[in-house]
Amino acid sequence: MVVKILVWSICLIALCHAWMPDSSSKLINHFKSVESKSFTGNATFPDHFIVLNQDETSILVGGRNRVYNLSIFDLSERKGGRIDWPSSDAHGQLCILKGKTDDDCQNYIRILYSSEPGKLVICGTNSYKPLCRTYAFKEGKYLVEKEVEGIGLCPYNPEHNSTSVSYNGQLFSATVADFSGGDPLIYREPQRTELSDLKQLNAPNFVNSVAYGDYIFFFYRETAVEYMNCGKVIYSRVARVCKDDKGGPHQSRDRWTSFLKARLNCSIPGEYPFYFDEIQSTSDIVEGRYNSDDSKKIIYGILTTPVNAIGGSAICAYQMADILRVFEGSFKHQETINSNWLPVPQNLVPEPRPGQCVRDSRILPDKNVNFIKTHSLMEDVPALFGKPVLVRVSLQYRFTAITVDPQVKTINNQYLDVLYIGTDDGKVLKAVNIPKRHAKALLYRKYRTSVHPHGAPVKQLKIAPGYGKVVVVGKDEIRLANLNHCASKTRCKDCVELQDPHCAWDAKQNLCVSIDTVTSYRFLIQDVVRGDDNKCWSPQTDKKTVIKNKPSEVENEITNSIDEKDLDSSDPLIKTGLDDDSDCDPVSENSIGGCAVRQQLVIYTAGTLHIVVVVVSIVGLFSWLYSGLSVFAKFHSDSQYPEAPFIEQHNHLERLSANQTGYLTPRANKAVNLVVKVSSSTPRPKKDNLDVSKDLNIASDGTLQKIKKTYI
């Protein structure tokens, strides 16, 4: 029996070492236990939802043949604000003739922005023939003013990875400009990127676009042109154009004169860095203090491993100042088709510096415009702190979307970013960015919640009003989920150990409360950085007699306590002790009474004895597991990098040197006959005229030598 237990223990431990589950989550909630509101649109056909705009009270959602106006508080539809726009029958039939399905040949709204006060521009796929309409708000409803072609602004396919951002009534878009999707471009009428120029755009998948300073930034992933000599690989990029770029002189009027791009480096450092190369989503630009007194503007990005690799996801933060610095740095150039991409010498860069924002780019010299066409690639953008702030390796899911509730205030006047991360299996992770004071790293505390009932991928995430509320957008469903889990904790210890800046323990009410519901922090207990619960009261099973200055309170405590005379001090089930002053809860130290040294009586009941028996049984079981672990440890060494969620490959070039012979199989010092213990039932081989024992060309060490033979 003991042997069986030992064997099963070893197997269990080996299985755990083979694949460690995601045990870092503080709290895991099932879909049914999450408070949420749902919106399903037509609930029959695919909608391909996308959030077009959001304000303090409403959220505009693009779907199949219409724009929905939803309340951001409960996702109820304001039908007076709905805009219907189906494709015409002619466009639908032409789409069917091109080989598309009926679901493809609909008008999926992808773009909405305000061109001027009181007017909206809406663009849709329109059965693979993009169109844009201008709506004017008159007499309480939106009326169509004009309709124009949307090629270059809106994608043909609702599932195509496109992005757009408006500035000063103009739309900057990143999409494709043909039916097949083979002409990607970054466009603002009339300027666009070069046609069929792989050095500018090479099969990109656009993720997000933001306006910052004098520039519009685009985040995307594409096939790396600088790696083509070695194979095919995907790199993450950030590209920029000037907001007021008017194009170049002469034939370059419809081309950008400020387009530059750089690789986003998200890697785990080491002798051979491990890269997360495929960007999936970015947050908005947020501002805060991260391990310094200076305020920084950063943007969070989700980057993953390729789809055919082991599932790995990482979150890297990039400082906007670093991105701007890279675009002011060295240009990269390939001398010949077989050359490496190297920095361009400074003396070969024309003046004024190409790619800068100028008042009128149409008067730039031709050499500047031509230089920027062929030298759009810059050096890499480093991640903040030089490494990801969160890494997750999982066979079950990958990160797909991210949004940030920036600089949430704690009761200790700390400001921390709360991140919401969507996955491709319908879950939302809540993570807290906790800067460490003396290290260049960020710690995270994570909570995982299942939001979509059928595991549909999360496409978008948006912050909603209220602590912990987030809008989760899927392909055919939108949910307003409350990821504030304060009320689920009933003990001070559990509440504090959540390390959630939204939650704190109210010592006055004995409740785990959301901070936005209280008016005073006086009685709150919270420790987001360490999760230290020393400030908590003892569990309710421990009866404490608290003596305060008020006589009425003293009488109440004496009345509710157990008389010491009625207890037998020799009874081993009775424990008497004195509380130390250090155990006094600071929250209870008020101006009225304060804390006093008091006697603590603890009585162990029958329930306590049952718990002791269970604990002893569990300890006995784990003793067998520990024995198995000891045996297993002899054959399984610990990871050299216990804190890393991956195993870094170290390929030492000197592995065959003298000091590395320990890795090689020792050579035999004498000849070994490998044919031993041949079964008698084995048929004897046929005799020939080659008697090995008579072959003098076989050396004693067993090495065969080439000989000449003559056959008659």
Curated annotation (Swiss-Prot):
Q: Any idea which UniProt keywords this protein has? A: Developmental protein, Differentiation, Disulfide bond, Glycoprotein, Membrane, Neurogenesis, Signal, Transmembrane, Transmembrane helix
Q: Signal sequence: where?
A: 1-20
Q: Which residues are glycosylated?
A: N42, N69, N161, N265
> Which residues pair up as cystines?
C95-C105, C123-C132, C242-C357, C266-C316, C486-C503, C495-C512
Q: Which InterPro entries match?
A: Plexin_repeat, PSI, SEM1A_sema_dom, Semap_dom, Semap_dom_sf, Semaphorin, WD40/YVTN_repeat-like_dom_sf
Any one of the GO BP annotations: axon guidance
Mark the transmembrane ranges: 602-622
Topology with respect to the bilayer: Single-pass type I membrane protein
SUPFAM superfamilies for this protein = Plexin repeat (SSF103575), Sema domain (SSF101912)
State the compartments where it is located: Membrane
Q: Where, in residue ranges, is this chain on the Cytoplasmic side?
A: 623-712
What are the residue boundaries of the Sema domain, all occurrences included? 21-483
Q: Which Pfam families match?
A: PSI (PF01437), Sema (PF01403)
Keyword Membrane set for record: yes
Which residues face the membrane's Extracellular side? 21-601
What is one cellular component GO term in this UniProt entry? plasma membrane
Top-rank taxon:
Eukaryota
* A single MF term (Gene Ontology): chemorepellent activity
Q: List the CDD domains.
A: Sema_1A
Family named by the database record: Belongs to the semaphorin family.
Q: What does this protein do?
A: Plays a role in growth cones guidance.
What is the protein name for this chain? Semaphorin-1A
What is the species listed in this Swiss-Prot or TrEMBL entry? Answer: Tribolium confusum (Confused flour beetle)
Q: Which gene encodes it?
A: SEMA-1A
